[in-house]
């Protein structure tokens, strides 16, 4: 497959990562054969260096460096929370118009890779959110005759593992399609009614200062077909959120 390249200069390159694709090889997923890092390397015939990650089921802007020095410089920006990130999510229910989630999250240890590690104290985790649109659909997923969803812009100010997914669960507005932190019954009903079967979380935008040129860079990624399908069914207009 060929990846959609969103931005490229002499030292950085960004793609629109498809949902379901791992960023790089992992011994925990030995059966996988398709990875964003290796696919991009083969596509541009040049080695690329990882800077940050997106969860496997998350789509959107994924940035790589084209040399190790740039990878180090950009990684420092991410670690120092100097990179602005914005995600789109579709969540269950009507969420408040906007707010800040300041809820510490425990470090998630892998059962195999971290089997000898000791549990760690919860770390600070902060996410800002804004409700962009709401919809009430004429089908039941529980005790009510209708089902409500919200389109939310999420801006994490820290970078904890699964932060957005865990914070939405904490608010009792889980992200639709989330098989780990979401409502499995609601997920199944959404698939039955709409045909959508992915995590509805998309890394829409990255904004940062280029370490070498000092230019302000903004990179945005369009939504895939399943997102566009839901927008159509929910009566949301694509151009209202991408400009």
UniProtKB/Swiss-Prot annotation:
Its EC number is 5.4.99.26. Transmembrane segments: none annotated. GO terms for molecular function: RNA binding; tRNA pseudouridine(65) synthase activity. It comes from the Bacteria. Gene3D superfamilies: Pseudouridine synthase. InterPro entries: PsdUridine_synth_cat_dom_sf (IPR020103), PsdUridine_synth_RluA-like_CS (IPR006224), PsdUridine_synth_RsuA/RluA (IPR006145), RluA_PseudoU_synthase (IPR050188). Keywords: Isomerase, tRNA processing. PROSITE patterns: PSI_RLU (PS01129). Belongs to the pseudouridine synthase RluA family. PANTHER family: MITOCHONDRIAL RNA PSEUDOURIDINE SYNTHASE (PTHR21600), TRNA PSEUDOURIDINE SYNTHASE C (PTHR21600:SF56). This is tRNA pseudouridine synthase C. The lineage of its organism: Bacteria, Pseudomonadati, Pseudomonadota, Gammaproteobacteria, Pasteurellales.
């Amino acid at each position: 497959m060929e990846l959609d390249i969103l931005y490229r200069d002499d030292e950085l390159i960004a793609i629109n990562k498809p949902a379901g694709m791992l960023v790089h090889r992992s011994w925990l997923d030995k059966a996988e054969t398709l990875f964003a890092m290796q696919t991009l390397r083969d596509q541009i015939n040049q080695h690329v260096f990882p800077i940050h990650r997106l969860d496997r089921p998350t789509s959107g802007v994924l940035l790589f460096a084209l040399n190790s020095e740039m990878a180090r410089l950009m990684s420092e920006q991410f670690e120092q929370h100097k990179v602005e990130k914005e995600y789109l999510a579709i969540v269950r229910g009507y969420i408040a118009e906007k707010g800040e989630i300041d809820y510490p999250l425990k470090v998630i240890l892998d059962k195999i890779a971290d089997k000898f590690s000791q549990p760690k104290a919860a770390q600070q985790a902060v996410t800002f959110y804004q409700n962009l649109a709401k919809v009430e659909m004429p089908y039941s997923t529980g005790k009510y005759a209708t089902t409500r969803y919200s389109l939310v812009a999420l801006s994490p100010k820290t970078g904890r593992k699964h932060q957005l997914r865990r914070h939405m669960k904490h608010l009792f507005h889980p992200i639709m399609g989330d098989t780990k932190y979401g409502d499995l019954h609601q997920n199944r009903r959404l698939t039955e009614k709409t045909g959508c079967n992915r995590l509805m979380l998309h890394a829409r935008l990255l904004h940062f200062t280029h370490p070498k040129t000092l230019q302000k860079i903004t990179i945005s990624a369009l939504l895939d077909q399943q997102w566009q399908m839901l927008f159509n069914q929910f009566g949301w207009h694509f151009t209202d959120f991408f400009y």
